[in-house]
A protein has these predicted regions:
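Catalytic core of nucleotide-activated saccharide and alditol-phosphate transferases
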Residues: 1-96
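Short, polar loop motifs at secondary-structure junctions
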Residues: 4, 36-42, 109-116, 177-180
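Generic structural signal for helix capping and beta-alpha/helix-loop junctions
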Residues: 8-11, 63, 116, 155, ...
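A generic structural signal for alpha->beta connector loops
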Residues: 29, 50-53, 103-105, 122, ...
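A local structural micro-motif
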Residues: 52-53, 107, 146, 174
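Conserved catalytic-core segment of nucleotide-activated headgroup transferases in glycan assembly
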Residues: 59-143, 153
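Catalytic binding pocket for nucleotide-activated donors in carbohydrate/polymer assembly enzymes
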Residues: 118-187
Length: 187
């Protein structure tokens, strides 16, 4: 079994929500591959009887995700759809700095951003960047902003694929803090 959203799965198991997995089924798997590592693996074993829980983190193909050599276009950028839970962090880490640094260029790329957001004039909004253009996008950033979903922040050890994409393309990453981050990107 490969669980690509272990923090959500655990919340559902704890709530006895059996939408796609029941607690009784977990011990039946030979392996439980988890998007999340760290203490979550022991919890899967202890609380739900997973026989062999192993971390199987997101990854990128380095032949696709690599620096493109394009000139830097933006000082700071974020790639991801609008989510209300990330709005405050994005405002604090991107929108507000953009307001205070009008001579710098910023970019937000993703779907579902409401028209009601008051973007500063130096923030470019791109509605969609197809996966085939992610390497180009990240390569043109001086800094890439990584914002982690709330349940993944609480669980830790849950790196998103966007984090690895940005790193593989040579972008300097500014990220919120979560347990385990330093094991993926040691000092």
């Amino acid at each position: 079994f490969y669980d690509i959203d272990t923090p959500v799965t655990l919340a559902k198991l704890d709530a006895r929500d059996e939408e796609y997995l029941s607690p009784a089924l977990v011990p039946a798997f030979d392996f439980y591959l988890s998007f999340t590592g760290g203490p979550t693996l022991e919890r899967l074993r202890r609380d739900y009887g997973a026989r062999l829980p192993w971390p199987f983190y997101c990854m990128v193909d380095p032949s696709i995700y690599r620096p493109t050599g394009e000139p830097k276009r933006w000082d700071l950028g974020y790639l991801g759809p609008h989510r209300a839970v990330r709005h405050r962090a994005r405002g604090r880490l991107l929108t507000e700095p953009a307001r205070h640094l009008p001579c710098r260029r910023f970019v937000v790329a993703g779907a579902q951003y409401p028209d009601s957001i008051d973007w500063p004039g130096n923030v470019e909004l791109i509605e969609h960047v197809p996966p085939s253009a992610h390497a180009s996008f990240y390569s043109r950033l001086r800094f890439a902003l990584n914002l982690t979903r709330r349940n993944m922040l609480a669980t830790g050890w849950s790196p998103s694929v966007r984090l690895f994409e940005a790193a593989a393309c040579g972008a300097v990453i500014l990220s919120d803090r979560w347990e385990g981050l330093d094991s993926f990107f040691p000092e």
